[in-house]
Structure formats: structure tokens, C-alpha cells
């Protein structure tokens, strides 16, 4: 009875107390609400949008910091006709930043057959286009024959000469070969040809030029449907070669390069059957004439060796000239004669003993076939390397005492120039090393040469092949979104092919690219012959497979600076110190990757001047492609004029850096746009802005003016050292390079802005994300201080809620001063007296506070700085209530989005986004620790600082279906009895903030790229702003301890966090020779001069 009476009294007391609180609140609002001032401020910054929709948002003046809308009740309500439509919201957003151009996402239209050319002629010319045939050769339309083929009819059968091109005009044609299954043999379709596609054996061209009959032993063509085909016989090639042999050198080189890239590299690197490409049953050279060679005198050895070399090179009448160039060498067993990946392309002719060729450390491929190959007396090497002008695929080691003759590179180039038949003989000799299986594979594989903007395939196309990028860069797009970009040796489309579904995305060429296309039917044939290939393909699929993009990340804009091989550097004005900038950047890049700097003056040292000025030169093009193989990153420095070199730089670039002076306006720097227009193919690469500022610049400014006019995928602000601006504008490039070589190169400051840019470009960027947690975020200050003391580099920063504020403070002042600014924010919050708090109270329609004092506090810390004007790249997370999604903010005025990221529901109202009018709330509700977003924006490693509270579910009271707050308050004050453990409103809010991102947090904790730091500060409340020092000390101690653990984990981890990680990319060795000669526009790779030599 007593218990019942006490409950009734408490209920009455609770109702009376609530009534009194409401009356007090109404009185305080009536007397202290600054209605006139707030109404004026609201009208000043949020004018009536019904009069002028273009004035939805006006930047606040510097000396009158007000706030965003206090409450929707304070504004004129729009009628249904005045509601902002999605189109109007989008228009408003576009005024803040330029939207990506359609060229980034839409490929060119498919090439159509011209009306003035017959389809059969057009398709034959397209099939021959990639061979780069000499201009002296012309196609005679009379030699093209058109045939109508019934279903099942055979067009080409084994035993016939393989000297014909077959092009499908309509219908389908199958390429078949025999395969054994048990005791039976079956016809296996290794490729299906459709309209516009062709069949011909490119290796047969070498035999045709040698006037040999290329026999077809393994292939037959059969019509899968009724079709029309065009045939053209290649016999005219030999006639043209006899008349102009020098002009066919480039075609021979293209054929052999295609063989190496399409067949040899593919089978070895991706299918694991490199040993099957070697012809173990090849006809060995006649070694009898070299019997007892070591017993001959020196003069006899030289005479006999020179005669044999001249005979092998096809110039027996030039023995006397060769004798002056040839040098004899002897080596013992175990001596390495040539190195793998070397550009030492001196020609070697073995006359005694035996050499063994070997690739890598493996003795056998996945099928158990030996990867070694023996070279006997009478063999020349490295013939394939000489032909393709690419690094050696194998090393050569002596198995016994060996005698060989060598002709240095410069000498035999002279012979090649004078006697082009040598080049053809080398190619014919190299084909003797290729197995019949490799030849069949080479006939079915296709080598695409795709111009900028062309589509490799389109969304919805049939997935019947996989592709390998051998050169260039491609981009996968989906409507208006970049999915992925692909560089050299990347795989494309293998997952779609494995899942047998239509292409999910469109893949287009960002620049001129070389692609190897492997049909699904060919892979099935290979798996039948060598089942071990299936395991290799599964590994490739597992590496390429990616989980579907979460909805919360579907709109993340990324710069995709992954696997960059070439970068074009374009000046925004003639006053930009371009050479100095390129040298500074080169110096920092060289500590991460093997880098080459090329400018027009550098290339002129190796080529005739007319080569640089020509619009198209295949020799220079090939030479530049070889540099991409030899170096991990090539910097192309453009000219200050619209020259062919500038055009070539833009065409060869994976990405473009536009360098501008931060102290000058955009109107004064319009040169870059003019230079970009000289690329008639259009600019489809990612284009990023780089602003150069004096070293003592406090804060950048003016970036918004650039991004309003043109789209840039990123922007970087660099505080340049004084030496960058010390040279007069007309100083010769050679003088500047000499200064950097003698004074600067090797001097690395990992804390500099140039070093930060180098890490971003090489994929070594370090990002840090600060999590939300209210006043517990004070621990972020201690964590940041520990990171700075440990010299951990921070290249990108992001955060949620209180972490967004701390991240923004570091982004604008990237040094220890940011810690002091964090403390100032907490001190500012403590200055609010009771009267200020009461004045900020309002009727709890959107929140119990107007947000006015909160706005002033945040804006006082950040002023009117734009996000794009930060020294360090910054983003923050908010919850978009209008679209029920996560928002990632990377541009616009900083303080409103930071404030919205800290807006706890129920306490302060959401902020109306000035760009589109969406309601934004605390980002902790969707992603409290956005390490995954930081990773998607290009960070290689992410340091995640978590100050969220851990769930403590122990001793929670099971109070049933209802509970009285007054009873809980009474129990808290009552000193007798057991403690009542019930979640209060703050605790409920905290837990709600983590409900939606629990799974994401677990993924982040276990991610290999993430270095997770959990700060144990659960004892602090989210409004304990008076305990800054205590929380900061805990953050400092724990973070320092965790960093020491990470450093001790491995040397690689330490180097990553300190910003000095070096990319592990296997790159060929440089040549040791200094001189270079060119022959028929095909120079070999020279040693880079001192001004471009990498450390």
C-alpha cells in the first residue's frame, strides 16, 4: 500500500515539474529572444528565393559572422508551386563547382564504313592498319576478292598457304584447330569472327618477306552462318620489300613486338605456360663446323667467326667490314653474359660451348615445362630484344666454357641501316624459337590499337573475351560515374567473362592504347590442352573481383591516380617556372619510383630536330613507349607554345597537371587552355590543378574561381621554396637543370608540399580520419600531437562530427598549431554563460537550440575559408535527410558543412545545404569513421582515430514497457538501495549514431590498409568540454604507443607511415652506353643524360 501511494505522489510531482519547466521556457523565450536581429540577419543571408532563385546563398561578410537558418519556422513557407525542384537544386549546385564534362564518361561514336569506300576494301585496310606498312606499298582493290559462304563451308584448310587475309563482311566465321581428348580428336573453335573482324597470321609476313611459303598446318576456317567474306593475298609484300627494304623495318618491328606482347608475355605472365611457347624441337644450327673451334689459332677463330656471322646475317659479302667490328670473348661456366630486363642489346654469336636462357627464378612453368632454353654454336642472341627494342625477357648464363663474338650496339646499327635484310634475317631466326602452339595462339589473339575516346566495349555488350593493357590508359565508366582506370599490364573484363554476363560498364581509351584481346574460346582451348591454366585463371579472377560498391559510396568522386605511368605538366601562364617545378617534382618522385623527365630540349639530344616537329613519327612514338617500360613514371614537360611536342605530351599522358601561380588570378593565366586545345583528340585524362605559393603564404585563396569555369578532378596547393622563383623567366633549361643536379637532387624533405604531391601521384598517400564523439574528440588533439612528434606524414584528412572540425583545422594549418586551435574551440565553448545558453533555447520543433551560438563558435574557428583552399586535401561526412544518404563534402565554404557534420539530432536543427537546399545532419549517423571513403579517394594507408564509446551492456535494468524519468532521477539522488542502470537521452543518442555503421566499423578495423587507433575515453561525456587536457593526454599516450607498435611491426610499415615508401615495380636496367644512333626512325633506348638520371 505504501509503495502504491509513493508511486502516485511521484507521478503527480513529475507532471507538476514538467508543467513548471514548460512555463519557464515560454517566459524565457518571450523576454530574451532577439527576434529583430535574427530576422534581419536571416533576410540578409537568405533572401526571398521566390524573387530571384540565383540568390539562394550569399557568402557572409568577414566582419559580420551570422549563421545558417535558426529554424524553419522563422522563414516564409514556400507554397507547393514554389518548392525547389531537383533541376533547380542541380542548377544551384553547378554554380558552386563545374560539373565533369561529358568527355570523361562518354566514348566517341563507333566508326562507320565511309560511303565512298566499299565495305570489303575498308575492312581489309582496317586489318592492315596496325602494321604501319610503308607508304610505298599501295592496296590494289582488284586484288580483293569477295566470296559468299554457306553455313559449314570451309574457307581455309590445313595444307594451304597461310598468306591470305580473310575479312568478314557479314555473318560469322569460326577459327578451328584440332585438340585431343583421350583417344579422339575434335575440332575446337578458338575464335569467332564477326562483321569487320579478320583472320591472318602476322608472323607469316616475315616468311613472305623472306620469300618462304608460309604453310598452314593447324588452322581451318569454317562458316558458322551464311556469310560474306573478303580475301586478300599478301604476296605483294615481298615485291615491295625488294624495292624498298628500309621502309619495311618498322613493319617487321611491329610484327615481332606484337608476337612478344600478345603471345609470349600473355602466356608467361597470365597463363603460366611460358615454357609451351618455346620450340623444343627446333632445328638446331649446324654445330659441326664449329667443332674443335677452341683449338684454332686466334686469327683462324676470328676469320671463321666473322664468316659465320656474315652468313647468318645474310651479308656474306660484307665479311671484311664485319671483321673490324667484331670482338671475341671467352667465359667460364656460371658466367652471366646478359641480364634479364637489361637494355644491353649488343649482338652475340656463339661459336663454342653453350649458353642457357632463363626468365626469372623459376625453372618450370605451371605445366612443369622447362622455362630454360639452350643456345648452341651458330645461334644469335638476343634477336627478339633487338627486333622489338624492348628489355631482354631472359638472362643468359654459360653452362660450360663458352666462346662468343659480340658486335656492340652502335656498330650493328650501322649495318642495319646499310643492310635492312639483316633485320629480316633476325626476325626469321627468332621465329625458329617459337613453338607451333604459340603460333596457333598468336593467330587467335587480337592486338587492339585504340585511339583516344574510342570504346573497347560498351555496357551491355557480350562478354566473350578478356583484355590486357600493354600500353596506354583506359577508363571504365557507368553513365556519369568513373568506376576504374586501367594502366599497363592491368586486366579488363575477366570477371564479366567468367560470370557470363553482359558487360557491366563501358571501357574507353583515355589516351592512345595497345590492348591484347584474348577470346573466351581460346582460353577454353588452352585449358583443354593444359588444365593447370584453370588454376591460374582463378587466381587472376580473384585478384580482379571486387565487391559491389555500397550505396553510401556510389557517388564518391575520385581522382583515380592509380598506376600512373606518364604525367604531362602544362603551364597556366608564361610566368610559371615550369622547368624548376618539374625538377622539384622529379626530385621528390625519384625517392618513390624510378622516374624520367622528358622535355623537347631533352629529346632533341637524341633525335633530329625534324622528328620533334613532325606531327606523327612512329620511331619517336615507339621510343617513348619503351621509356614507359624502362621507367615507372615519365614526366612530360610541355612547351609554352602549341607545338607538336606539346600535342604529343598530352596524347601520351595518363594524367595532366596544370601548374598555376597562386598569387595571380585565373584571368591572367589562360595559356593552359590554349595548350590543351592543340590535342585534336580531346582531353579525357584526369586534369588536376597545382597552385604554387610563396613559402610564407598563410592560407591559399581563389580556387573557387578556377573550378567554376572548368572541371578539375583535383587541386593541390604547394608552398614552393624560394629557389623555385629565383631564376629569370628566360633562363635556359640546361642551366636550371645543372643547378638542380649539383645543388638539389638527393635533398629530400618528406614534410614538404612537393613531397606530399609526389606521394599522391605515386599512390603512397597517407590519410587520417577523425571519428565523431562530441567532447570526447578532445583526444584527437593529443593523437595529432603524437603523430606530428613521430613524424608521421599526413597527405589527406577527413572526419565526421567533431572529427570533421579537427580535420578542417589541420587542413588549414597543417602543423602543431592545429592542436592549439582545437583547444581554443573547447575554451570558446566554455565561455558561454547561462544567459547565452538560455537565449539560444527555442521551442523544440527542430531542436531545443537555435544553433546560433554554435554557428558563431564554428565560424569563428574557420572563418570563411573554402574547402578547396586548404593546404591538405579535406573532406567531411554529413547525413542528408532529404535524400536519405551519406554526403561527402569536398568543396564550398568550410564552416557550414563542418557545423552540419556536428549537428546532433534533437539539439540543433539541420543545416540547409546552400548548393541544393538539402537538410544536413551529423555524419555520425551514416559513417562515424570514414576510413573507407579516405581509401576510395586515393590514400594508400589510412590512420583511423576512433573516439566513439564502446557499448557497455552490463547491469542494464529491465524496466519493462514504460519508465518514469522522475523515478530515475529520484533513484539517482536516493543514497539507499541499488543503482538503477538505465540509458539516458545522451546515451541513446550516442548509440543511435553507431547503429548504421557498426558493420562498416568492423570492416575498417580489419582492413589491411587501415591503422586503427581506439582511444579509451568512454568515461568522458559528449558535452564534457571542460576536460580537454585530460582527454588530449589520453589521446597522446595511446596514439604514441600505437605508432611505436606499428613502427616495430615491419620496416615497410614504418616507411609507409613516414612517407618514404618506395614502390616495388620491376623496371628494366638502363644501358651503359652514352651514344645513340638512329636508323629508319627507330632509335634504341639510350642512357638518360645526367639531367634525367634517376637515383
From Swiss-Prot:
Subcellular location: Membrane
Enzyme class: hydrolase
Chief location of this protein within or outside the cell: membrane
Motif DGA/G per UniProt: ranges: 922-924
GO terms under biological process: lipid catabolic process; phosphatidylcholine metabolic process
Pfam family membership, one: Patatin
Bias kind Basic and acidic residues: ranges: 80-105
UniProt: a nucleoside 3',5'-cyclic phosphate 2 binding residues: 327-416
Region Disordered, residue ranges: 75-113
Residues involved in a nucleoside 3',5'-cyclic phosphate 1 binding: 144-237
Superkingdom to which the source organism belongs: Eukaryota
Span of the annotated motif GXGXXG: 772-777
Family note: Belongs to the NTE family.
Name the UniProt record assigns to this protein: Putative patatin-like phospholipase domain-containing protein M110.7
Origin species: Caenorhabditis elegans
Origin organism lineage: Eukaryota, Metazoa, Ecdysozoa, Nematoda, Chromadorea
Amino acid at each position: 500500500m505504501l509503495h502504491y501511494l509513493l508511486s502516485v505522489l511521484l507521478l503527480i510531482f513529475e507532471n507538476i515539474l514538467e508543467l513548471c519547466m514548460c512555463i519557464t521556457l515560454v517566459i524565457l523565450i518571450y523576454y530574451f529572444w532577439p527576434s529583430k536581429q535574427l530576422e534581419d540577419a536571416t533576410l540578409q543571408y537568405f533572401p526571398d528565393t521566390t524573387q530571384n532563385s540565383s540568390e539562394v546563398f550569399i557568402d557572409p561578410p568577414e566582419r559580420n559572422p551570422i549563421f545558417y537558418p535558426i529554424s524553419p519556422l522563422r522563414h516564409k513557407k514556400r507554397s507547393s508551386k514554389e518548392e525547389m525542384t531537383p533541376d533547380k537544386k542541380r542548377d544551384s549546385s553547378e554554380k558552386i563547382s563545374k560539373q565533369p564534362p561529358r568527355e570523361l564518361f562518354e566514348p566517341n561514336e563507333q566508326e562507320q564504313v565511309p560511303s565512298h569506300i566499299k565495305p570489303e576494301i575498308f575492312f581489309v585496310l582496317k586489318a592492315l592498319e596496325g602494321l604501319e606498312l610503308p607508304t610505298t606499298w599501295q592496296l590494289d582493290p582488284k586484288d580483293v576478292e569477295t566470296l559468299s559462304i554457306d553455313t559449314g563451308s570451309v574457307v581455309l584448310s590445313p595444307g594451304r598457304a597461310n598468306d591470305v587475309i580473310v575479312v568478314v563482311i557479314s555473318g560469322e566465321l569460326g577459327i578451328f584447330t584440332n585438340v585431343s581428348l583421350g583417344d579422339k580428336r575434335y575440332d575446337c573453335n578458338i575464335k569467332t569472327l564477326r562483321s569487320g573482324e579478320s583472320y591472318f597470321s602476322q608472323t607469316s609476313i616475315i616468311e613472305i618477306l623472306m620469300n618462304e611459303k608460309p604453310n598452314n598446318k593447324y588452322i581451318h576456317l569454317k562458316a558458322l552462318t551464311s556469310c560474306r567474306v573478303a580475301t586478300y593475298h599478301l604476296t605483294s609484300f615481298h615485291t615491295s620489300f625488294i624495292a624498298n627494304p628500309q621502309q619495311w623495318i618498322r613493319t617487321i618491328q611491329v610484327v615481332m613486338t606484337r608476337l612478344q606482347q600478345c603471345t609470349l608475355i600473355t602466356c608467361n605472365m597470365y597463363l603460366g605456360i611460358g615454357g609451351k611457347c618455346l620450340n623444343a624441337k627446333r632445328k638446331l644450327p649446324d654445330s659441326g663446323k664449329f667443332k674443335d673451334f677452341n683449338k684454332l689459332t686466334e686469327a683462324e677463330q676470328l676469320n671463321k667467326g666473322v664468316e659465320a656471322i656474315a652468313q647468318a646475317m645474310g651479308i656474306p659479302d660484307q665479311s671484311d667490314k664485319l671483321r673490324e667490328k667484331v670482338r671475341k670473348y671467352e667465359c667460364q661456366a656460371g658466367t652471366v653474359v646478359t641480364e634479364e630486363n637489361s637494355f644491353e642489346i649488343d649482338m652475340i654469336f656463339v661459336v663454342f660451348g653453350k649458353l642457357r636462357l632463363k626468365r626469372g627464378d623459376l625453372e618450370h612453368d605451371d605445366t612443369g615445362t622447362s622455362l630454360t632454353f639452350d643456345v648452341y654454336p651458330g645461334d644469335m642472341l638476343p634477336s627478339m630484344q633487338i627486333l622489338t627494342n624492348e628489355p631482354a625477357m631472359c638472362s643468359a648464363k654459360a653452362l660450360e666454357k663458352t666462346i662468343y663474338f659480340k658486335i656492340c650496339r652502335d656498330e650493328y646499327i650501322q649495318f642495319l641501316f646499310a643492310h635492312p635484310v639483316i633485320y629480316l634475317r633476325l626476325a626469321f631466326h627468332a621465329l625458329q624459337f617459337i613453338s607451333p602452339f604459340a603460333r596457333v595462339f598468336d593467330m587467335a589473339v587480337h592486338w587492339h590499337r585504340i585511339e583516344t575516346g574510342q570504346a573497347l566495349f560498351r555496357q551491355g555488350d557480350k562478354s566473350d573475351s578478356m583484355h590486357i593493357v600493354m600500353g596506354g590508359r583506359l577508363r571504365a565508366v557507368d553513365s556519369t560515374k568513373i568506376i576504374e582506370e586501367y594502366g599497363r599490364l592491368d586486366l579488363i573484363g575477366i570477371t564479366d567473362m567468367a560470370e557470363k554476363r553482359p558487360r557491366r560498364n563501358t571501357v574507353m581509351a583515355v589516351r592512345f592504347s595497345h590492348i591484347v584481346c584474348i577470346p573466351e574460346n581460346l582460353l577454353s582451348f588452352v585449358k583443354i590442352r593444359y588444365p593447370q591454366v584453370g588454376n591460374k585463371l582463378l587466381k587472376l579472377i580473384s585478384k580482379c573481383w571486387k565487391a559491389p560498391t555500397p550505396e553510401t559510396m556510389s557517388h564518391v568522386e575520385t581522382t583515380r591516380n592509380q598506376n600512373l605511368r606518364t604525367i604531362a605538366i602544362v603551364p597556366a601562364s608564361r610566368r610559371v617556372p615550369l622547368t624548376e617545378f618539374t625538377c622539384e617534382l622529379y626530385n621528390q618522385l625519384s625517392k618513390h619510383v624510378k622516374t624520367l623527365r622528358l622535355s623537347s630540349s631533352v629529346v632533341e639530344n637524341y633525335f633530329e630536330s625534324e622528328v620533334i616537329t613532325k606531327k606523327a613519327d612512329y620511331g619517336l612514338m615507339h621510343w617513348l613507349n619503351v621509356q614507359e617500360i624502362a621507367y615507372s613514371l615519365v614526366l612530360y614537360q610541355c612547351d609554352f607554345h602549341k607545338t607538336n611536342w606539346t600535342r604529343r605530351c598530352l596524347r601520351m599522358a595518363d594524367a595532366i597537371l596544370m601548374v598555376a601561380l597562386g598569387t595571380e588570378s585565373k584571368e591572367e593565366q589562360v595559356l593552359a587552355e590554349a595548350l590543351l586545345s592543340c590535342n585534336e583528340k580531346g582531353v579525357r585524362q584526369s586534369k588536376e590543378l597545382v597552385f604554387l605559393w610563396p613559402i610564407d603564404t598563410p592560407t591559399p585563396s581563389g580556387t573557387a574561381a578556377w573550378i567554376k569555369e572548368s572541371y578539375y578532378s583535383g587541386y593541390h596547393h604547394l608552398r614552393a621554396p624560394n629557389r623555385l622563383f629565383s631564376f629569370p623567366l628566360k633562363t635556359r633549361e640546361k642551366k636550371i637543370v645543372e643547378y638542380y643536379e649539383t645543388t638539389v637532387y638527393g635533398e629530400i624533405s618528406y614534410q614538404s608540399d612537393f613531397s606530399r604531391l609526389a606521394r599522391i601521384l605515386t599512390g603512397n598517400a597517407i590519410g587520417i580520419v577523425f571519428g565523431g564523439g562530441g567532447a570526447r574528440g578532445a583526444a584527437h588533439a593529443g593523437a595529432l600531437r603524437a603523430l606530428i612528434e613521430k613524424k608521421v606524414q599526413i597527405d589527406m584528412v577527413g572526419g565526421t562530427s567533431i572529427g570533421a572540425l579537427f580535420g578542417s583545422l589541420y587542413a588549414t594549418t597543417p602543423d602543431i598549431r592545429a592542436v592549439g586551435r582545437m583547444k581554443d574551440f573547447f575554451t570558446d565553448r566554455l565561455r558561454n554563460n547561462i544567459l547565452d545558453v538560455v537565449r539560444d533555447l527555442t521551442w523544440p520543433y527542430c531542436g531545443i537550440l537555435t544553433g546560433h551560438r554554435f554557428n558563431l563558435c564554428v565560424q569563428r574557428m574557420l572563418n570563411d575559408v573554402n574547402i578547396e583552399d586548404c593546404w591538405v586535401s579535406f573532406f567531411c561526412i554529413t547525413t542528408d535527410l532529404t535524400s536519405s544518404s551519406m554526403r561527402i563534402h569536398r568543396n564550398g565554404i568550410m564552416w557550414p558543412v563542418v557545423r552540419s557534420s556536428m549537428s546532433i539530432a534533437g539539439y540543433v536543427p539541420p543545416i540547409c545545404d546552400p548548393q541544393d537546399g538539402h537538410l544536413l545532419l551529423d555524419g555520425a549517423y551514416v559513417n562515424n569513421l570514414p576510413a573507407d571513403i579516405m581509401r576510395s579517394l586515393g590514400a594508400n594507408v589510412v590512420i583511423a582515430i576512433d573516439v566513439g564509446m564502446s557499448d557497455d551492456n552490463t547491469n542494464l535494468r529491465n524496466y519493462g514497457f514504460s519508465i518514469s524519468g522522475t523515478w530515475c532521477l529520484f533513484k539517482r539522488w536516493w543514497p539507499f538501495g541499488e543503482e538503477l542502470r538505465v540509458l539516458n537521452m545522451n546515451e541513446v543518442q550516442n548509440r543511435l549514431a553507431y547503429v548504421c555503421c557498426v558493420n562498416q566499423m568492423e570492416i575498417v578495423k580489419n582492413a589491411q590498409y587501415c591503422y586503427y587507433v581506439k582511444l579509451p575515453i568512454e568515461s568522458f561525456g559528449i558535452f564534457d568540454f571542460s576536460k580537454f587536457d585530460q582527454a588530449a593526454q589520453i589521446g597522446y599516450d595511446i596514439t604514441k604507443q600505437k605508432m611505436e607498435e606499428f613502427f616495430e611491426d615491419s620496416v615497410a610499415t614504418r616507411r609507409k607511415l613516414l612517407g618514404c615508401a618506395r614502390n616495388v615495380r620491376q623496371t628494366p636496367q638502363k644501358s651503359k652506353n652514352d651514344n645513340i644512333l638512329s636508323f629508319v626512325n627507330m632509335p634504341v633506348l639510350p642512357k638518360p643524360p645526367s639531367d634525367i638520371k634517376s637515383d
